[in-house]
Amino acid sequence: MVRQSGSELSDQSDTDISADSDTSASQGSARHSARGRHRDSRQKGDSSSRGQFLERVVRINRVAKVVKGGRKFSFSALVVVGDGDGTVGVGYGKAREVPLAISKGIESARKNFFTVPRVASTIPHPVQGEAASGVVLLRPAAPGTGVIAGGPVRAVLECAGVRDVLSKSLGSSNSINVVYATLDALKHLEDPASVARRRGLDYYHVVPKRIVRAVNSVGASSDTA
């Protein structure tokens, strides 16, 4: 039997420990790099899918729930999402953290998309929408007017791609009611082409004349330039 001295045993144990530590470190770095690649690819996918839409956070509210052990805080977010070209939706998200509440609101808004009829950059006719005690009036405007509206109404109209419009809030100033009243107004808009077919009229007899003149003047000036 060959006996090893204490120094040889200690050197061998140190070598084994260092080898194990090197192996575990390499495995940990490999797992970390794999997680990093997965996270980066997931973030790139989210950014590419969200890059096609406009997102506006209208309101963030903190809610407290009183329980036996104290108070539990959560957040709610009202979010407007649209493609800026006639499609818009509104969602409401709730979570324990603000970013998660906003992401839930975005997903909810995408499930509620609908199409907004437009004439050039404005709406085809005056319309009024109501939601609870909120009342919003929308009127067509000539090209170049811009969005004459407050914060909640402006967020909905910009995401819907309406760039020239006049608006007035006649009821509650609560942002949630105002947003849903604006949505109700947009949902009551009718496509001028379908109205003209139903009435047996020409398209330009349905659209307001001042809007037609303004659109024609803008087109003529662009052709001249």
Curated annotation (Swiss-Prot):
Query: Which residues are connected by disulfide bridges in this protein?
Result: none
Identify the Pfam families for this entry: Ribosomal_S5, Ribosomal_S5_C
Enumerate the SUPFAM superfamilies for this protein: dsRNA-binding domain-like (SSF54768), Ribosomal protein S5 domain 2-like (SSF54211)
Q: Is Ribosomal protein among the key words of this record?
A: yes
Renumbered residue ranges of the record's region Disordered:
1-50
Q: Name one GO cellular component term.
A: small ribosomal subunit
The record's annotation in PROSITE patterns points to:
RIBOSOMAL_S5, S5_DSRBD
Per the record, where are the segments of Basic residues compositional bias? 32-41
Q: Domain S5 DRBM spans what residues?
A: 53-116
A molecular function GO annotation: structural constituent of ribosome
Which Gene Ontology BP annotations are present?
translation
Alphabetic keyword roster: Ribonucleoprotein, Ribosomal protein, RNA-binding, rRNA-binding
Record-linked InterPro entries: Ribosomal_Su5_D2-typ_SF, Ribosomal_uS5, Ribosomal_uS5_bac-type, Ribosomal_uS5_C, Ribosomal_uS5_N, Ribosomal_uS5_N_CS, Ribsml_uS5_D2-typ_fold_subgr
Q: What role is this protein assigned?
A: With S4 and S12 plays an important role in translational accuracy.
Q: What HAMAP family does the record point to? A: Ribosomal_uS5_B
Under the heading NCBIfam families, the entry gives: rpsE_bact (TIGR01021)
Record's comment describing the protein's domains: The N-terminal domain interacts with the head of the 30S subunit; the C-terminal domain interacts with the body and contacts protein S4. The interaction surface between S4 and S5 is involved in control of translational fidelity.
Subunit structure as annotated in this protein's UniProt entry:
Part of the 30S ribosomal subunit. Contacts proteins S4 and S8.
What family does this chain come from, according to its entry? Belongs to the universal ribosomal protein uS5 family.
What is the official name of this protein in its record? Small ribosomal subunit protein uS5
Name the source organism.
Tropheryma whipplei (strain TW08/27) (Whipple's bacillus)
